[in-house]
């Protein structure tokens, strides 16, 4: 079970969350977001992070973009020392292919905001391009980090060819039924472990890992 904590803005919190057991940290590269961090701010955080997770695997550092230009994505990856790119907008399979060609060693995560079963049908063309999928709640006002949950039963028959993250309104209180119902490859949390946007609640993060540890033993 891969655990990604998204919306990291502060070096000390990033280090603490990695130390508590995170497999991946996410940095919001969408300027309209209250969790937005510049490439230089990301670099300050990533330089402070441990290189490995508690499992002894590489700690992945993911930049989250939405309908961004390819040059901006490449620059942010290089300056921020990122190991992954999450595309959370309306990026086409062709654009995803361009990202892969430009950044072949970087993990490509394609996110989908699920409105209905029809959204799941749109995923197929991306499975030959992306490394990982992420399924999030759909809200018209924001791209993510809203705290909104959604109808997870839509995913009961979801069997993609790629590993996938479940996101959207997850908290330490509801993560157990989410994981046991759907058995995703990973979970992605942001607002569910925050005091305010970009300010993580380390006690909630600790509770989350206690829940996950109980499930995977």
Curated annotation (Swiss-Prot):
Pathway: Amino-acid biosynthesis; L-tryptophan biosynthesis; L-tryptophan from chorismate: step 3/5. InterPro entries: Aldolase_TIM (IPR013785), PRAI_dom (IPR001240), RibuloseP-bd_barrel (IPR011060), TrpF_fam (IPR044643). It comes from the Bacteria. One of its GO terms (biological process) is L-tryptophan biosynthetic process. SUPFAM superfamilies: Ribulose-phoshate binding barrel. One of its GO terms (molecular function) is phosphoribosylanthranilate isomerase activity. Its EC number is 5.3.1.24. The keyword Amino-acid biosynthesis applies. It catalyses: N-(5-phospho-beta-D-ribosyl)anthranilate = 1-(2-carboxyphenylamino)-1-deoxy-D-ribulose 5-phosphate. Keywords: Amino-acid biosynthesis, Aromatic amino acid biosynthesis, Isomerase, Tryptophan biosynthesis. It holds the Pfam family PRAI. The keyword Transport does not apply. Belongs to the TrpF family. HAMAP family: PRAI. This is N-(5'-phosphoribosyl)anthranilate isomerase. It comes from Acaryochloris marina (strain MBIC 11017).
């Amino acid at each position: 079970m891969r655990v990604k904590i998204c919306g990291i803005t502060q070096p000390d919190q990033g280090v603490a969350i990695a130390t508590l057991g995170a497999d991946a940290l996410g940095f919001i590269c969408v300027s309209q977001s209250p969790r937005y961090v510049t490439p230089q701010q990301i670099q300050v955080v990533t330089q402070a992070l441990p290189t490995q997770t508690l499992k002894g695997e590489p700690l992945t550092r993911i930049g989250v973009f939405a309908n961004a230009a390819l040059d901006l994505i490449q620059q942010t990856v290089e300056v921020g020392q990122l190991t992954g790119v999450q595309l959370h907008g309306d990026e086409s399979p062709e654009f995803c292919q361009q990202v892969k060609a430009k950044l072949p060693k970087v993990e490509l995560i394609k996110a989908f905001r699920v409105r209905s079963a029809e959204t799941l049908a749109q995923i197929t063309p991306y499975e030959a391009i992306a490394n990982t999928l992420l399924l999030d709640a759909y809200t018209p006002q924001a791209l993510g980090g809203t705290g909104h949950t959604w109808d997870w039963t839509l995913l009961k028959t979801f069997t993609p060819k790629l590993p996938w993250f479940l996101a959207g309104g997850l908290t330490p209180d509801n993560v157990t039924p989410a994981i046991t119902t759907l058995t995703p490859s990973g979970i992605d949390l942001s607002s569910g472990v925050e005091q305010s946007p970009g300010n993580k609640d380390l006690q909630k993060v600790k509770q989350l890992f206690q829940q996950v540890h109980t499930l995977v033993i």
